[in-house]
Amino acid sequence: MAKDVKFGIDARKQMMDGVNVLANAVRVTLGPKGRNVVIDKSFGAPTITKDGVSVAKEIELENKFENMGAQLVREVASRTNDVAGDGTTTATVLAQSILQEGMKSVAAGMNPMDLKRGIDKAVRAAVEQIHLLSTPADDSKAIAQVGSISANSDTKIGELIAQAMEKVGKQGVITVEEGSSFEDTLEVVEGMQFDRGYISPYFANKQDSLTAEFENPYILLVDKKISNIREIVPLLEQVMQQSKPLLIIAEDVENEALATLVVNNMRGGLKTCAVKAPGFGDRRKAMLEDIATLTGGTVISEEIGLSLETATLEQLGTAKKVTVGKENTVIVDGAGNSADIENRVESIKRQVEESTSDYDKEKLQERMAKLAGGVAVIKVGAATETEMKEKKDRVDDALHATRAAVEEGVVPGGGVALVRAMNALSELRGDNDDQNAGINILRRAMEAPLRQIVTNSGEEASVVVNEVKSGTGNYGYNAASGEYGDMLEMGILDPAKVARSALENAASVAGLMLTTEVMITDLPQGDDGMAGMGGAGGMGGMGGMGGMM
């Protein structure tokens, strides 16, 4: 296929045009008074959003060179969102500003490689300064404030996230779901819950709720199907002597074994309940091991030389309470050794760090939370489906931002942290004038988020930026109320991780784009096909045939 190739200034100009289209669409959403963006959908009602990354993901441009520029800046937003969960709009504004200043310098004849080196040097100094500015986000109040700001000043969402973290721990799993009412609610599932219910409804001993509830039961964990009752008779007799109920978690319980257990249950003999093990394949084995660690039991597996016929009570787990429903099983207060549980959690945490798949990471984090003791579900309420989608996006953002705040602490929000980090660049010098120009490019760009927040709130950006720069520490501008003051005291915080990631990612992609000299894209199919017909142009001479008449 034939290619279209552009060089130098022409290539960079078209790329910059694409950057401006995307960045100008995204930047209007920044800050507490950011504007809405309406996105048309091929089906259903248009989406209304103030979420920068949602806007960026929708933009595809017709001109392929411009589109390349737009997609590279979209990469900045997506990467920042993946790492920190927020700060996408800030990163986009920073990238656009670095590029605009940088392109002017390149056009003036400066060396793009030295400009990039200067920018990189400045980023390292600014990131160190951001770390020095950060304070730990230990208490619920700080967590609630971060959540509220990320959810576009919705204090209810911030408070719900803080409550959820209090209930399930800062490393616990918190999920966001669509609710069925107008109100936002928080539900916490205590203990370990997995999505498998009883194999037969005849195991239910609470007819009003159709659940099987056991106090202090034994828990048998098996990684194969049980179909022959004779395999488990010796163990059932041992359990019977203890007068305790038995929960069986196996790959499956079927045929004669299932029938015998059900009949025994209905006659009031040994109280039992059989449940299929959660997950599939290797994940099933891992989850059985998790349950074994939580309950202090051992998985009966032929792979390690254990068989059901020789199983003893010591190999069974126990828990304070077990509730088995049609679709879920909850094990509360397992009798496992707390040191073993902590080691298991640490082991899973290492797997999360090594995993490259988002799906695997999510599943590993769920397992970790279940071991740690609970899952919190924030149910988002709204009047319409459009509002529901927009709100759910905001809650997801807020949740990611609060996690980032817990990891690396918080810094003053509203663009102030970046303005203060500029101080680290005032004495910084490069190896030559072009590198110094790169340092100055970043210094000017670091004002851009504050300028945009002020512009979106309808005030004069230059006046506010000069006032903020004249102050020190946490002194900044509250765009929501139009007041100056201590940003931390006013509850305007950003996670340090968000500010750091936005700056690093924006500078990284902008540096690559500044040093771009050639752009290559496919020619449209029509152009390519017509190129071979160029010889037909000679037929224009047929106009002379008019003289033959």
UniProtKB/Swiss-Prot annotation:
Forms a cylinder of 14 subunits composed of two heptameric rings stacked back-to-back. Interacts with the co-chaperonin GroES. The gene is groEL. HAMAP family: CH60 (MF_00600). GO terms for biological process: protein refolding. Its EC number is 5.6.1.7. It comes from Psychrobacter cryohalolentis (strain ATCC BAA-1226 / DSM 17306 / VKM B-2378 / K5). Belongs to the chaperonin (HSP60) family. InterPro entries: Chaperonin_Cpn60_CS, Cpn60/GroEL, Cpn60/GroEL/TCP-1, GroEL-like_apical_dom_sf, GROEL-like_equatorial_sf, TCP-1-like_intermed_sf. Its main location: cytoplasm. One of its GO terms (molecular function) is ATP-dependent protein folding chaperone. It is found in: Cytoplasm. Keywords: ATP-binding, Chaperone, Cytoplasm, Isomerase, Nucleotide-binding. It comes from the Bacteria. It catalyses: ATP + H2O + a folded polypeptide = ADP + phosphate + an unfolded polypeptide. One of its GO terms (cellular component) is cytoplasm. It is an enzyme of class 5 (isomerase). ATP binds at residues 29-32, 50, 86-90, 414, 478-480, 494. PANTHER family: 60 KDA HEAT SHOCK PROTEIN, MITOCHONDRIAL. NCBIfam families: GroEL, PRK00013.1, PRK12849.1, PRK12850.1, PRK12851.1. This is Chaperonin GroEL. Together with its co-chaperonin GroES, plays an essential role in assisting protein folding. The GroEL-GroES system forms a nano-cage that allows encapsulation of the non-native substrate proteins and provides a physical environment optimized to promote and accelerate protein folding.
